[in-house]
Amino acid sequence: MPQLTRSAELFEKAKQFIPGGVNSPVRAFKSVGGTPIYMAKGQGAYMTDVDGNTYLDYVGSWGPFILGSMHPRITAALEHTLTKIGTSFGTPIEMEIEIAELLCQIVPSIEMVRMVNSGTEATMSAVRLARGYTSRDKIIKFEGCYHGHGDSFLIKAGSGALTLGAPDSPGVTKGTANDTLNAKYNDIESVRLLVNENKGNIAAIIIEPVAGNTGVIPAKPGFLQALRDLCTEEGIVLIFDEVMCGFRVALGGAQERYGVTPDLTTMGKIIGGGLPVGAFGGKREIMERIAPLGDVYQAGTLSGNPLALTAGLETLKILRDENPYPELERKAAFLEEGFRNNMNKLGLNYVQNRVGSMACLFFTETPVTDYDTAVTADLKKYGTYYHAMLDQGIYLAPSQFEAMFTSAVMTDEDLEKTVKANYVALQATQK
């Protein structure tokens, strides 16, 4: 068990000044118990905490670090921008055009794009745009999907909201809640029912094409295409929230992997290379409704700042030029097979879901295809498993309902170490 004396001291101090001691709820370890770990440094696939313990990192800053931490090309580019260019001007810069052009080239749905500062900003802006474009009010989301902490999305939400047992949040007005309808993930009939009950009133359907905030839940074959067809028939804007799976499951995201093109796409995490960046983009005729060209207002003081765009642009260029995706697939498949073999040896039948380098081990024997099946997972067993992995230097998300991310810089030795640790941790769940 790692010694966490300094982390414990810092957490006690933080609770005096920061609500719950953290700036994002899942970091407080409420789901798994124990002391939140304060990190001091990241390098490649590893992190070191303030007590000197080192961990193999499968959280990757909650997804952005597909290339690991402190990638030399990204670090060098940031140093150049910081010392030779500046951090922010509040004016247009040439780099904005460069990253926008690149996004239009690599993401199938994007003809125009607007940069923002977070995934939450991207999803909030995309929904507002869809409402303005269609002159309709209601949206359909899916139970357990998480689209940031905007009011419209905190109704049967995933991620930290689900982790803390509060998928619905106080502070969301009844009017807002009434305009958000929830369908069952992977159930097209539940969507059709809502559309028929609200004929002509649905502005958008927003979905994670790979649900990554209820653990990891892949879309069933044909489900995304059925949504695409329904939205086309009904004049509804289809929004793919690719904040997590964008640039992760393929260079062009889940829409490239599955061959289904939405009307709008929201992006975050990897697009910022570890700095706060988001974006939303899509069809030109829809995007042209955004101010100053159109009448749908959206703005941001630090949107498109050179420091954040440097990290994002360099990350995207590396992904485009080096194409790590086949190797990421191999590495993630190695872990999946290793975990399965371990469970077979121990007579266990827990569920593994994986899409590319996003994966989740659910502590349930029920196939996980939606919110209802995800919450059958045994959270106490996950907590035991989590700490048993942590004791062996493997850092996972402190929540059953988050993804495990494989990074391109992980070595075969790292993967073998993880499989061995998994066996020991699975044994611990049987005690």
Curated annotation (Swiss-Prot):
Its EC number is 5.4.3.8. The keyword Isomerase applies. Its cofactor is pyridoxal 5'-phosphate. Pfam families: Aminotran_3. Gene3D superfamilies: Aspartate Aminotransferase, domain 1, Type I PLP-dependent aspartate aminotransferase-like (Major domain). Pathway: Porphyrin-containing compound metabolism; protoporphyrin-IX biosynthesis; 5-aminolevulinate from L-glutamyl-tRNA(Glu): step 2/2; Porphyrin-containing compound metabolism; chlorophyll biosynthesis. Keywords: Chlorophyll biosynthesis, Cytoplasm, Isomerase, Porphyrin biosynthesis, Pyridoxal phosphate. It comes from the Bacteria. GO terms for biological process: chlorophyll biosynthetic process; protoporphyrinogen IX biosynthetic process. It is found in: Cytoplasm. PROSITE patterns: AA_TRANSFER_CLASS_3. GO terms for cellular component: cytoplasm. Coiled coil: none annotated. It catalyses: (S)-4-amino-5-oxopentanoate = 5-aminolevulinate. One of its GO terms (molecular function) is pyridoxal phosphate binding. Homodimer. HAMAP family: HemL_aminotrans_3. NCBIfam families: hemL (TIGR00713), PRK00062.1 (NF000818). Belongs to the class-III pyridoxal-phosphate-dependent aminotransferase family. HemL subfamily. This is Glutamate-1-semialdehyde 2,1-aminomutase. The lineage of its organism: Bacteria, Pseudomonadati, Chlorobiota, Chlorobiia, Chlorobiales. The gene is hemL.
